[in-house]
Design a protein with these regions (language model features):
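Surface-exposed loop/turn motifs at beta-strand-loop junctions within extracellular Ig-like
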Residues: 27-29, 134, 185
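Short amphipathic alpha-helices and their capping/turn segments at secondary-structure boundaries
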Residues: 63-70, 114-126, 185
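Conserved, mostly hydrophobic/aromatic
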Residues: 23, 80, 120, 130, ...
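Short, acidic/polar
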Residues: 102-120
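Carboxylate/His-rich catalytic cores and anion/metal-binding grooves
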Residues: 120-149
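Aromatic- and acidic-residue-enriched carbohydrate-binding clefts of CAZyme catalytic domains
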Residues: 91-107, 140-190
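Loop/turn elements at helix/coil->beta-strand transitions in domains of secreted/extracellular proteins
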Residues: 74-75, 123-128, 189-193
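The feature marks proteins involved in alpha-glucan
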Residues: 3-104
């Protein structure tokens, strides 16, 4: 169907949860098509090759809301990069380079200092600004993700509405990146951050 000029719509019957898909775009009548991933996808396969139908509300349930915050001038904001803060070989974090690495409590460096979430909380931080956590293109999510291997801060977005797969424990599972990012957010909220 074409409800408005330049807008196309398709409805499928049945439960499509978990179905992978792409669009084929044809710009001129009789022209060849260009395959594209849905720019509004909420889940994708590894390396963002295909969109995946997922009911995020059903998957995650209701989000935990933080209590209202006082004056903005009281905010203590800490900017962090998921991989940088969790990948180090001496930080005591189990899920290195992953969203889940920022959910771990009781982590310490080899020298005995707080690390990860405990370290951030000990600073009195009220807010964190995460460097890009959306799906970006320059890291092969199925490649070598160990310390010293592929590295990028993520300023090459591909799918703005999808968490980055290299930060998930299983980048081939479209749901794990969503669920684990939510766990990261919940862990910070549990600390009042």
């Amino acid at each position: 169907d074409q409800p408005h000029p330049g807008v196309w719509e398709c409805r499928l019957s049945g439960d499509q949860d978990g179905a992978e898909y792409t669009y084929t775009l044809v710009f001129e009548a009789g022209g060849s098509g260009t395959e594209s991933v849905d720019p509004y996808a909420r889940a994708v396969t590894a390396n963002g090759q295909r969109g995946v139908v997922v009911n995020v509300d059903k998957l995650l349930g209701q989000a935990t809301r933080m209590p209202s915050f006082g004056p903005a001038s009281d905010a203590i904001i800490y900017e962090l990069h998921v991989r940088d803060l969790t990948i180090g070989p001496e930080n005591g974090i189990t899920h290195k380079g992953k969203f889940l690495g920022l959910t771990e409590a009781g982590t310490r460096t080899d020298a005995g200092n707080l690390s990860g979430l405990d370290y951030i909380a000990s600073l009195g931080v009220t807010h964190v600004q995460l460097l890009p956590v959306f799906d970006f293109g320059s890291v092969d999510e199925t490649g070598d993700l160990r310390f010293g291997a592929q590295y990028n801060w993520g300023y090459d977005p591909v799918h703005y509405n999808v968490p980055e797969g290299s930060y998930a424990t299983d980048p081939t599972d479209p749901i794990s990146r969503i669920r684990e990012f939510r766990q990261l957010v919940d862990a910070f909220h549990a600390r009042g951050i």
